Curated annotation (Swiss-Prot):
Example of a GO biological process term: potassium ion transport
Residue span, RCK N-terminal domain: 5-121
Name this polypeptide is given: Ktr system potassium uptake protein A
SUPFAM superfamilies noted in UniProt: NAD(P)-binding Rossmann-fold domains, TrkA C-terminal domain-like
Organism taxonomic ancestry: Bacteria, Pseudomonadati, Pseudomonadota, Gammaproteobacteria, Vibrionales
Length: 220
């Protein structure tokens, strides 16, 4: 393992879990894929660092896998709600730093929140929000709900904003909103100089409360 490589574990290898594994692995991270289904584990073994058949609703299994050594653990167990909740509880009690969990509905999400899940994803709901935001504003290229009312969005600079600076947009004056960076061509500039003059086609990446982001984008 290279120093500085992030380590992720994904528990549950349905379509969602496998997609998460592949994206994380392609980004250069170290990925452990876990499922009770041997066929799914074999599929994941073709592209992740390590794939194991195991049941993470057992405390001994979680201890043996040393999940507390991982930067993040994603619990992507789909159909079995009880297994998802139990795996989350065991992971938190084992000292896992950051537990992300896929939830099927708001009731499950509330239960997961109460037992300590650090981040809850509801894929169908989140995709619906993303699509709606992009339909409402064609400048929005990506809209990612992050949970707890927060979202990250990427929007493109058009003719109305050309020649203005990042400071002129006053994004950071909106409570809770931060500019993470912007993209010009292939280059991504993190922590950008707010005096940067914008050009048509620049992508601006911001994070903040969903409602405040939406209202601010309408005003630009």
């Amino acid at each position: 393992m290279k120093t500085g490589d992030k380590q992720f574990a994904v528990i549950g290898l349905g379509r969602f879990g496998l997609a998460v594994c592949k994206e994380l692995q392609d980004s250069g991270s170290q990925v452990l894929a876990v499922d009770i289904n041997e066929d799914r584990v074999k599929e994941a073994a073709g592209f992740v660092s390590q794939a194991i058949v195991a049941n993470c609703t057992h405390e001994e299994t979680v201890a043996e896998l040393k999940l507390d050594d991982y930067d993040m653990v994603m619990i992507a167990i789909g159909a079995d709600v009880n297994a998802s909740i139990l795996a989350t509880l065991i992971a938190k009690e084992a000292g896992v730093k950051s537990v992300w969990v896929k939830a099927n509905d708001r009731f499950q999400a509330r239960v997961l929140q109460k037992i300590g899940a650090d981040h809850i994803i509801m894929p169908e709901r989140d995709m619906g929000i993303r699509v709606a935001r992009k339909m409402l504003d064609k400048r929005v290229l990506e809209f990612h709900p992050l949970g707890s009312g927060l979202a990250m969005t990427e929007f493109v600079v058009g003719s109305r904003l050309m020649g203005k600076t990042l400071s002129d947009l006053a994004l950071c004056k909106v409570e809770g909103v931060q500019v993470l960076g912007y993209k010009r061509g292939p280059e991504i500039i993190k922590a950008p100089d707010m005096s940067t003059t914008l050009e048509i086609g620049d992508l601006i990446i911001v994070v903040g409360p969903q409602d405040k982001l939406a209202n601010k984008l309408k005003s630009l």
